[in-house]
Curated annotation (Swiss-Prot):
Heptamer of 7 subunits arranged in a ring. Interacts with the chaperonin GroEL. GO terms for molecular function: ATP binding; metal ion binding; protein folding chaperone; protein-folding chaperone binding; unfolded protein binding. CDD domains: cpn10 (cd00320). This is Co-chaperonin GroES. It is found in: Cytoplasm. One of its GO terms (biological process) is chaperone cofactor-dependent protein refolding. Pfam families: Cpn10. The keyword Chaperone applies.
Amino acid sequence: MLKPLGDRVVIELVQAEEKTASGIVLPDTAKEKPQEGKVIAVGTGRVLENGERVALEVAAGDLIIFSKYAGTEVKYEGTDYLILRESDILAVIG
């Protein structure tokens, strides 16, 4: 299992639509980069200048929206994940 460090979060991407509302199948090159994902694991939190640790606002299982070009894509045990900082998360869905 991936365990992120500090204020980082591991997410599993929610796949982009394969076809448009009118039924046109989109090739991979035409798909938008996904901006939604499910939080799989969270780090221990951000450390302030005084040494105090601040817990992250998201938790495993949360569905989130994140910045379009944020994070680092990794493949672990055949599954694609994205590791990003909490500051790149824009919203929690629901």
